[in-house]
Amino acid sequence: MPGRSTSYRVYHTAIAALCALGLASALAAGPTLAEDTKLLKTPVSPVPPLFDSAAIDKATAALDGIVETAMKRTGLPGLAVGVVYKDKVIYAEGFGVREIGKPGKIDPDTVFLLASVSKPIASTIVAKLVGEGVVDWHGTAKSYNPAFALSDPYVTENATIADLMSHRSGLRTGSGDLLEDLGFDRDYILSHIDQQPLDPFRVTYHYSNIGYTAGAIAAATEAGKSWEDLADEVLFKPAGMASASYRHADYISHKDRAHIHARLADGTWAARFDRNADAEAPAGGANASLNDMLRFMRLQLGGGTLDGKEIVKADALAPPHEPQMIPGPPRSPAARAGFYGFGWNVSYDDEGRARIGHSGAFELGTATNVTFMPGEDLGIVVLTNGMPIGVAEAVGAAFLDVAQNGKQTVDWVGFLGGLFDQMRAAEAPEIDYADVPASPKPAQDLAAYTGAYGNSYHGPLTVSADDRKLSMSMGQQGAPVAFALSHFDGDTFSFETIGENANGLAGAIFTVGSNGKAEKVVLDYYDRTGLGTFVRE
């Protein structure tokens, strides 16, 4: 995601890394001057593999126990995990049930929602178009999709597919997500993100589902196809990913599908929700089986070739696997930077070995992880049907831990579960609307608040009173979402947030004019970027 003049810095960083890598290899494998005054002409390269076949066999043999222990500790309903090594599937197993309380077992053909593991699939699809000359990573989204627009004219004209798919457009994390929760479709969301504020272009990293989607849709528009049909045509069918799709309806139609589960406050699990991510399909709307994803993993490790057939040109598939943006600088001199490619997280060990992966998470009930190490010709896929609690990542981390160290050296389930708990705690609302004042100021007569309000981003809002109770409705025309309003204090009411991004109770703060009627209402939950004010019409 370089947008500044970075070629000088990147050049010297690359040279420094190569020198360090070569020095480490030479010290490990080459003669010393004391032993032999004949110097090597070049450093030892490439870096030797981290694992051998025996190490992989040991880690694979440990997987059953790793998974069973993780599921027992957490109560996770179901999981599927597979390993690819040297272009062969050496492990593919399902554990647990498709839906809690029902007998259907998970197997390698069970279809899961992938959440953000959809992103590396999407970048592979765009890479196919790049390889065919249909689009270029550095072609502008506007040139491919004239409807594309952001709030800054310069960014609108200059943002490339690369900018959008590496999260460096300036769109803030969560932009457009709450529209999706309200039921708005992709066209509506993409046509309204030009109201979202932007942070500095190509300078800031903000993980943005709708920004990523905009980049992928620009490519599909240039190809003259819907995203869903394009995925089928250029990837899923050629790669033999028989169950894979970017249509939520296809997921629902599968009898052998993993229902999604949320963990309740008492620690039990329940299949309460559905999660239709069609609006952001390239970023989060794919569904596939473990067997599909193992073919996808082989394609990545094979540089675009699968079963001897070139599906994506290697030079077009390489950029997604390479650093394109730095999500955050190292926090200490001893730490290392993590990078983002196009739909992939990219990191390197001390000797320069790449580790590439991505996680997916729906709070409503799914968590996934894919990780591969191209230098080791090794990849692992973990799919779960429970909300993100760190298990998907922990299984992959424990597998690699055993491969490298002969045993687990970290309590990965505990460690990663704790991180997820911390992230949720950090998202707690600033105001606890459940803590109603002991002596709240009285509300106006409810008629003061009722009526129609307008908002150019979220659309119309209707406030109604019935049987001494206030409610509001908003969302997609013809299918609005209703919210009950409970009095909190004075002209402030509370309502329960909904959908993937739900965060407990939020506030509806009315401003009442001199005529005794509310002039506007601010919904603080929808006002994160200043777009939550609804004005009386």
Regions found by a protein language model. Give the residues of each.
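Bacterial N-terminal signal peptides that target proteins for export
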Residues: 2-18
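Short, conserved catalytic-motif segment at the N-terminal edge
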Residues: 51-114, 134-136, 143-144, 150-151, ...
